[in-house]
Each structure stands twice: as structure tokens, then as C-alpha cells.
Amino acid sequence: PVHLSLAFNPSHLEIVNPVVEGSCRARMVRRGDRNGDHVLPVLVHGDAAFAGQGVVMETLNLAQTRGYGTRGTVHIVINNQIGFTTSDPRDTRSTIYCTDVVKMIEAPVFHVNGDDAEAVVYATQLALEFRQRFRKDVVVDIVCFRRLGHNEQDTPAMTQPMMYKKIAAHPGTRKLYADRLVAQEVIKESDAEAMVAGYRKARSEERRVG
């Protein structure tokens, strides 16, 4: 069995990172898990916060230390290419990629297209295998988009009209993947529709999915 603990993430972006690392380190000590075989920290980031929040660098700096290291963390960056109202990389950071900050600890980064579901799974599996083999941090940069605004009052179409014109015309990742499976004759179109209906029904009835 796998025990999963989700840390409470406040509105202060990325501040939960050292909390997760400290919790995992404590669990490793309690279990006598010196090599990180049984405890795995996973951090989910946004692209703008990952590059912009100082606590990210502070946490990375402790990654390989004897007193605070957790034998490698898997970082998942949800790169929706927009930080509030700034979408031009020339205005958001001084590096090409939002993940360039991990060069400070020489962690590998897998950049993957969020529209390719199987590629995302493969990259994540590869990242986990790297962590288990080398016991170092690793990053999966999922390049995708945000359909709606940052919150109920945010309308990105006002500040990013060109970007959101393209997003509005995008069918969605699920539809793209379903169409691909139908084209490959893996499933029928009716199967895809039934899966969506079944999932929504299960969620509305508070039943376990999968």
C-alpha cells in the first residue's frame, strides 16, 4: 500500500516547499530510511512562481545537504506560460526556461508537451526512475495552458487577447487524446463519450473513480 500525504498549501506561492521537504526528512528519520527508498517528496509548481519566488532557490540549496536533504525530490512544473498578466518571457524572467533555476544543483529537466498525455506519463516515469537511481532532484516541465483565469475576477482575454484567442479555439487535451485513440482504433468514439459520462457521474455521486 502507498500512503499519500498532501500538504496544506496557502496562498503564499511555493512557501509549502520547505514544509514538504521537512516533513519527508522527518518521515525518513522515523523510518530509518537513509536512502529515500520509502519516502518520496513531490512538489507541484507554477512556472512564474518557480522562477520568481526566492523560497524555491532556498529549498533547492538544501537538496543535497546532509542535514536537510531528502535524497531527491520530483518537481512537477505546470507551465501555463502566464504569470498573472505577464506572458512574454522577456518580461517574466532573465532566462529562457522557467526551470533554469535548477541549474544551481545540476538537476535534469524534462520539457514535455502537455497536449501529449502519453509523453507526459513517459517523462514522469523517467523522472521517477532518475530519482530512484541517482537520488537527486529532477524536474518535469509540462508546457500547457490555462483555460480560465487566475480566479473568478480574472479575465485573461483582456490582458492576453492573442493567447486566449488561440486557447478558445483549442479543443482541449482530453479531446485531442480521445481523437488520437479513435484514429488509432484503440477505442470507439462512443467509448470516449461513455468514459466522460461515467467519470462525471461517479464524481457527482461521490464514488471512487478508476
What is each model feature region?
Residues 206-210:
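Conserved small/polar residues in nucleotide/adenosyl-binding loops
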Residues 1-106, 110:
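Cofactor-binding active-site loop characterized by glycine-rich and histidine/acidic residues
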Residues 87-91, 102, 107-205:
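Phosphate/diphosphate-binding loops
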